[in-house]
Each structure stands twice: as C-alpha cells, then as structure tokens.
Swiss-Prot record:
The gene is rnhB. A divalent metal cation binds at D6, E7, D98. Transmembrane segments: none annotated. Its main location: cytoplasm. This is Ribonuclease HII.
Length: 181
C-alpha cells in the first residue's frame, strides 16, 4: 500500500495548518483527473474530493495557530503530516510526502518528493481533500469572524485581510509569530 500526504495552509496568517493522508482502495478510474489542488478550480476540487473520500482510506490532522506560534510553521506542518498518518492506523509499504522534508513517521519506507502534489496521485489526492477540508473550515470561521472575509481569502494574507487586521486588530486564531502580525 502507498500513502500520500500533503498539507495546506502553510502560508496562511489565520487558523491551523491542515494535513491529509490518503491510501487508495484499489485503482479508481478518476486518477487521470487528479492534479495539485492549487491548479484546480473550486468546483473540480470539490467534485474530486468526494470521489477521493469514497475511494480511499484517509485521515485529516490540524495543528493550531497556537502550536504554530510555539514550534514554527515548518515543524507544525511536519507534525500535521505525522498525525494524519498515525490517525490512518494502517501500516504502509511506502509513504510519500509532498516537499523536501520527512515527518517523524514509522513506515517501512518514506520519501519526500518536491512538487509531489503535481506528480504522485496519492499526494495529489491528499492535496485536494486537505484544501477542500480547510476551505470549509475557513467558511465556518467566517461566520464567527466576518470582519476578515475568511470565506474569500481562506486565511491567506491578502491586501483586504491585512487591511482588516489594521482596522480591527487580530483575532485569537491569527498566527502571531508571522511577520505581518
């Protein structure tokens, strides 16, 4: 079995970093439609996400903004990947992670692949479901913190988001360790 892992929200200034781990059940017929989540339109991501969830074993993990501020975004991203894999509770022959760093995962073989979210189907799938999951989370947070337009910026440091912070201050879910904050 091959497990693909990716994270989303690394460059955000609001909320958690979120990771997903994916193992396909068999060989689904939609694999040729997969791509890096950043290259797909929202409707396509959501469509593929539902197919991925139906045809895979998967797990999500979030690492909070408080933890990000304590251990830094790099270590928080690796921790989210580690937790997502551990939550799967399936021993894999091969674990492939997006990027150049390897989280602390106990597996027979683990490999980091730069641009893996554009190359490896399992990582592409993890990228897609992680992005859809985090976007939904930001839509929910937008109901609590409407001043920051999280439904539009998804927690990223857009011009409007930065202006809202200047005008209203930061919330308890903003990452205080980031330069702009």
């Amino acid at each position: 079995m091959i497990c693909g892992i990716d994270e989303v929200g690394r460059g955000c200034i609001f909320g958690p970093v979120l990771s997903a781990a994916v193992i396909f059940k068999g060989n689904p017929n939609f694999l040729n439609e997969l791509d890096d989540s950043k290259k797909l339109k929202k409707a396509k991501r959501e469509y593929l996400s539902s197919l991925i969830l139906e045809n895979s074993y998967y797990a999500f993990a979030e690492v909070s903004n408080e933890t990000i501020d304590k251990i830094n975004i790099h270590h928080a991203s690796l921790l989210a990947m580690q937790i997502a894999y551990e939550k799967l509770d399936i021993n894999c022959d091969l674990v492939l992670v997006d990027g150049k760093f390897i989280p602390k995962i106990k597996a027979k073989k683990i490999q980091a692949i730069i641009k893996g979210d554009s190359i490896i189907n399992e990582i592409k799938a993890a990228s897609i479901i992680a992005k859809v999951q985090r976007d939904k989370l930001m839509d929910e947070y937008n109901k609590i913190y409407p001043l920051y337009a999280l439904n539009k910026n998804k927690g990223y440091p857009t011009k409007e988001h930065k202006e809202a912070i200047k005008k209203h201050g930061i919330s308890n879910l903003h990452r205080r360790s980031f330069k702009f904050i």
